[in-house]
Swiss-Prot record:
This is Glycerol-3-phosphate dehydrogenase [NAD(P)+]. Keywords: Cytoplasm, Lipid biosynthesis, Lipid metabolism, NAD, NADP, Nucleotide-binding, Oxidoreductase, Phospholipid biosynthesis, Phospholipid metabolism. The gene is gpsA. Catalyzes the reduction of the glycolytic intermediate dihydroxyacetone phosphate (DHAP) to sn-glycerol 3-phosphate (G3P), the key precursor for phospholipid synthesis. The keyword Cytoplasm applies. NCBIfam families: PRK00094.1-2 (NF000940), PRK00094.1-3 (NF000941), PRK00094.1-4 (NF000942). Its main location: cytoplasm. It is found in: Cytoplasm. Pathway: Membrane lipid metabolism; glycerophospholipid metabolism.
């Protein structure tokens, strides 16, 4: 079967490494934390992220990035968006042949407003680029790793890469569709994190189902507006990489973005909430990026604007809700 390196030892990278191993592939994980590497090699666990799960014993781990980079020609990039450019640049300096990069990050770069596939493309030389794709959709790691039925989308500018992703990951509990709209799938995965934080705030404040439904619906509308302006197919946002990912992230306590929002809605400061969670919350960085990107593109994104004021200007959550509800009359 196929050899694959998984860069990143977070919850989703670990869950997908387990899928790949169970599908018969040879998997090497890379991470910087020596304790996590040792724990995985010795005990087949990653307790920090997937506390009670015993992983496939065939998964190995290393902290040596050169070993990881030269293990195979296929990489699963399971890193936070803010770490992607640095790690892919380092990988590029260590390899001498084409590699296929599959990423699962859901974010937008702060300074450049680039999607993750664009960041990877920037970071590697042309003669090392064997194709770049994304695997995205409603897929909590905690459910994937215990084989709960899950359905996701694989996308790339190169259809061969989309089909490769489908072939590598698909099994009887993980169904993978291909989708040729890379822009839409990446934007859907990133932008829904903004709405998920807002959804958590609404829940934390004690508002009911009406408010939650309105937030998700109007959130999808502003995601679609920006996506279409950036070249995405609006129909993509009605699929797994759009509304599918939006629903699961806006309604589940598995979601870091929702959990952060919930804590903010209950009155915690962002520092207090993040200290309790001790995990990367992509929605914070994405809100910052998209707030400025929307202004640059002249796209109306009222929920994003309101959340930006909460996260970065210390606007009270009650005032932000009042501002949203008090906007001028308009047609849907």
């Amino acid at each position: 079967m196929t050899k694959i390196t998984v860069f990143g030892m977070g919850s989703f990278g670990t869950a997908l490494a387990n899928v790949l191993a169970e599908n018969g592939h040879t998997v090497l994980m890379w991470g910087k934390n020596e304790d996590s590497v040792k724990e995985l090699n010795d005990h087949h666990q990653n307790k920090r992220y997937l506390k009670d799960v015993v992983l496939d014993s065939r998964i190995k781990a290393t902290s040596d990035i050169k070993e990881a980079a030269n293990f195979t020609d296929i990489y699963l990039m399971a890193l936070p968006t803010k770490a992607m450019r640095e790690v892919t640049s380092e990988i590029d300096s260590l390899i001498d042949s084409k590699k296929t990069f599959i990423h699962v990050a859901k974010g937008i770069e702060n300074d450049t407003f680039k999607r993750v596939s664009e960041m990877i493309e920037d970071s590697i030389s042309e003669d090392h680029n064997g194709g770049i794709g994304v695997l995205s959709g409603p897929s909590h790691a905690e459910e994937v790793v215990i084989k709960q039925p899950t359905t996701v989308a694989a996308s790339s500018k190169d259809e061969k890469v989309s089909k490769l992703i489908q072939d590598l990951f698909m099994n009887d509990y993980l169904r993978v569709y291909t989708n040729n709209d890379l822009v839409g799938v990446e934007l859907g995965g990133a932008l829904k994190n903004i709405i998920a934080v807002a959804s958590g705030i609404v829940a934390g404040m004690g508002y009911g189902d009406n408010a939650k439904a309105a937030l998700m619906t109007r959130g999808l509308a502003e995601i679609s507006r920006l996506g279409e302006k950036l070249g995405a197919d609006p129909m993509t946002f009605l699929g797994l990489g759009g509304i599918g990912d939006l629903i699961v992230t806006c309604t589940s306590t598995h979601s870091r973005n929702y959990t952060l929002g919930f804590k903010l809605g209950q009155g915690q400061t962002m520092d207090e909430a993040l200290n309790e969670m001790n995990m990367v919350v992509e929605g914070i960085y994405t809100t910052n990026s998209v707030y400025h990107l929307a202004k640059q593109q002249n796209v109306d994104m009222p929920i994003t604007n309101a959340l930006y004021k909460v996260l970065f200007e210390d606007n009270p959550v009650k005032d932000s809700v009042k501002d949203l509800m008090g906007r001028d009359k308009k047609s849907e």
